[in-house]
Structure formats: C-alpha cells, structure tokens
Amino acid sequence: MRRLCALALILAIAIPTSAFAHGVVGDYVFLEPLIAEDPTPANEWDVVQPSWNKTSAGNNFALGSSLEKVLYLDENYMARVSVGIGTEWHYQWVKNAPDQRGFDDLEMFAKWAFYVSAKHEFLLSAAALLEVPTGNPSVEEQSHTSLGPLFLWEKGMGDLPNWTAIKYLRPFGFQGDFSYLPALGGHTSHLMSADQVVEYSLPYLSNSVQDIGLKPPFRNLYVFTEFNYSQIITGPSGQTFPSVVATPGIAYVSYHFELSFGTQLALNRASVPDTHAVVIGLLDIFYDSIFTKAGNWTINKGFPE
C-alpha cells in the first residue's frame, strides 16, 4: 500500500494538468466523493478504496473497488447513461470474538443523467441500485437482496458574478444524493441515506477565476467536506437510530486519476461508537484517458475516430 501511494504521488507531479476527464459539467470539474455517490456518469475505475475505523466493538479494515462504464452520449458528447459494479473486502478485529474476514455485498447500478445545464454547471441524475448478498455473511451489511432508487445532483457556483468580493465563491461546488434501499425479503434492513458534499476547487480558482500563482501539485487540489446520513428505518430493535457524520478531506485530481484522503467525525450520539478513529482513501483511475478508443466506446457512438 505504501508503494502504491508513493507511485501515485510521483505520477501526480509528473502528469500534465491542463485538462480533466472526469465529472465535467460546463467549466466545473467535480471530484469523486469518498462516501457520497458520484452524480456524473463516467468511465472510471476505483482501483482501491482503503478504509480503517476503530469502533466500540473493535476495528474494521476494508478494501473497496468498483468499475463504471458510460454507455450513452448525447449530441454534445455529454455522458448520460452508465452502469457499474463494486464490492468491498473486510477484515474485522472484534473484541472478545474471533476475527472475521471476507467480501461484502455485490453492488450494481445503472445511472441516468436526465438534466444537464453546462451554462449553470448543474446536473441531475437518477439511478437504480441493486445489492446482492454474495459475500461472507459474517461481514455483510445485508443478508437479503436489496433494490431501490437513488437521486443525485451537483451544482458549481461559476455563474456567480465575477465581482471582487464574490468571485472567490465561484470555485465552490456541491454534490449530493438521496437513496432508499429496501430489502426484498426477510425482516432486516430498509436503509435510507443522504449525502451532501461541499468542495472548493483550486483548479477552478486558478483557471476560471484568478491565477494566484499555485504550482503543481497544489494547483490541482480540492478541499471538501461530506455530510453523510444513514438510517435503518425498518429493522431490528435498537438498530434504527440515524447516523450523521462529517467526512472532511483533500483530493488531487489530474487528467488521469484522483487521489483522495479523509477522516470522519461523529455529528450525533448514534454515530460515535463507529467513529472513534477513521481513515479513508481513494485511488480513482479515469481509464478513458488512458485507453482512448476502448475506454470511450458507447452504444450510440461506437468507438471514437
């Protein structure tokens, strides 16, 4: 893992920073969140998403990975439809009990960006999310298949006036989602969740507002905070309290990849037992910038010329 992170940092400095390949709506480039779902259909591979958290019951280490593929482009070559798949591997050190390890549920989704305004850096999308209990029952979140809707949005603030006192607000961006994921059988969880991401883009500041002299890698940094809510609204007694946490972090976004790190802070009493200490990371590859023909294939446009 140390070697992987070191290699990513070396590449971050070496790769040109004049263009981006992910999450582009108008002039704003939205990052890939750590916890929240990404509203933008994209060709991307979350190669590894490591996380460690110390809880009241012990410790949990997870390695997540997911893959997303754009299937449809509109007449302006904006990605409109994508599908994806992902899972996590867990190792849990449980107090006064044997260690548990194995894969979590298999997650699959189909995403549709049904409204895009490049002028206002605004996008709305919807997705269908399916979770199948294909992993180890001792570490899985759910023992029954779940299927439900996901509503997503993102908005850049670039349409604010370029006045002296206001222009520095233009690099702000907002991403969010709301989902309801009921189990299709059994008496276990019906999960409701919502996320809101507030991000500040130093690339946007330098390229679209005012160049303040930042050099790589600082020129390509984002600072962000996610606000994450989740709650089992139908489930076992004593397990239906809402969990609300803040996930602050920093991200480096280049033409080929994103490298992010963050932590989590409890915002209500119910989330304290699961957030004694948390570290989260993400290495996300925008593979259509590397495999420019195969990675950019879509159903309606085929391979790029």
Report the location of each language-model feature.
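Transmembrane beta-barrel domains of Gram-negative outer membranes and organellar outer membranes
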Residues: 21-185, 189-305
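Positively charged n-region of N-terminal signal peptides that target proteins for export
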Residues: 1-4
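Bacterial N-terminal signal peptides
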Residues: 6-16
